[in-house]
Amino acid sequence: MATHHARRLPAAAAVLLLVLLAGGSAADDASSDDDAGVPPSPGCSNKFQLVKVKNWVNGTEGTIVVGLSARFGASVPRDIHEAQKTFAVLANPLDCCSNSTSKLTNYIAIAQRGECAFTAKAKIAQTGGAVGLLVINDNEELYKMVCSDNDTSINVTIPVVMIPQSAGKKMKGLLDQGARLEVQLYSPNRPVVDLSACFLWIMAIGTIVCASLWTEFVACEQVDERYNQLTRKDGPNSGTTNREDKEIFEISAKGAIVFILVASVFLLLLFYFMSSWFVWLLIVLFCIGGIEGMHVCLVTLLTRICKDCGQKTVQLPFFGEVLTLSVLIVPFCTIFAILWAVYRHASFAWIGQDILGICLMITVLQMARLPNIRVASALLSAAFVYDVFWVFISPLIFHESVMIAVARGDNSGEAIPMLLRIPRFFDPWGGYDMIGFGDIIFPGLLVAFSYRFDRASKRGLFNGYFLWLTVGYAVGLFLTYLALFLMDGHGQPALLYLVPCTLGLIVILGWFRGELHDLWNYGRSQTENLVDEP
């Protein structure tokens, strides 16, 4: 990427984050049940279902445990009112690989994983009269219980559910102490319309529109560069005569391809070497970029609202003359980011993450620019291939989707922060709807370019490109969530839908209007004229 007048260190950190954020550009539903990679067979063709295991100890309700149903056996009810509350008992022997000496009739049996096949455990529990079987895993994962190749006749008519090791040990300990344990198994449906996804859809579109219109409708017309950063004042006329001297990264076609290659290498590094310390490194970088973005947005907004705020300055060592408002806002932004990092696992932490992320993306979309559609085609086409490869094709090579594994933080236990996310408030399974920064910034660069082109060409709202590209992005993002729904929540490469709906749309519109040549070469003549000037 080519840079023009690059002078500020925090902005360099924001660009580094732009490289990092590409690792989270797959929309993913981390809490969905997953049938991929485990083909069904005759008599063993149930769809895997997440199961809620509601439990009571001596009549007192405990914490709901989430389990996973098997490929075989009966399905658990969808409605809690159809699920029966049943007493549970430990199988004896605990592995349930031979006839139990404890009474299982009309009980839900609890057995330990191991020593024999899952189908064998289920048949023995069923023969003993059990009405269900809970299998305690040997770790916290929910292992997919399938049939073995030797199972030729499977006639299991009771539900079989895998539960995590910690929950199983707790249940076993209570039963060993003589407590009465009751359980209720059910698997509620997710809502057809996910309102949280609608809110996320609005946030993503709003971020792009806000970033595109920011300079004209938010930034002051006559504003000193000092509002933007703690920078030295270059001269008495630096604010008005050198406004274009602010940092702008104009992306080149070659730089776009290199960027995607570097992002791919970085994604592989995250996939293989992601750990808790690596996550902390990403968190620190995200906080730096978020502080920079929030500082720029707040100072710009306040200066726009209160003109006098942009007049008071103070002399600082090294920085020289800077706005007093800028100095006062830096601690607020820093404290905000630190508090988010400390409480990032809290239920409300998504609010702070989204605020920092939106501010960062608005700032990046002000700083990085596409000069024309030629460069946009190189960048978005490469990003399109990148997204599709690392989500859909990488499982054929790495046995799992690299993009989704990195976004979920499978190797570190924590998702990367370069995501906008909203809790599923109306989903009985909880979880988050997420969208990676790359799915907003890459198309956002093109939408912002279309607005600049419309302004330079003095076009109206309907005969320009900005409105139609905004609508195209909205449609593309809608198609992404529709694909998520149709694919049962399996992660989708959002750019698969967003690139055709934005880049494809502007190319078709430009060709139809006879303006494709102007869009393709926009800015090149101006650049050549600048180079020829003494």
Curated annotation (Swiss-Prot):
Glycans are attached at residues 58, 99, 150, 155. Its EC number is 3.4.23.-. Disulfide bonds: none annotated. It is found in: Endosome membrane. A motif (PAL) lies at residues 493-495. InterPro entries: PA_dom_sf, PA_domain, Peptidase_A22B_SPP, Preselin/SPP. Glycosylated. It is a multi-pass membrane protein. Residues 93-172 form the PA domain. GO terms for molecular function: aspartic endopeptidase activity, intramembrane cleaving. Residues 28-198, 274-276, 343-347, 399-428, 487-491 are lumenal. Its main location: membrane. The chain crosses the membrane at residues 199-219, 251-273, 277-299, 322-342, 348-368, 378-398, 429-449, 466-486, 492-512. SUPFAM superfamilies: PA domain (SSF52025). The keyword Secreted does not apply. Belongs to the peptidase A22B family. This is Signal peptide peptidase-like 2. The gene is SPPL2.
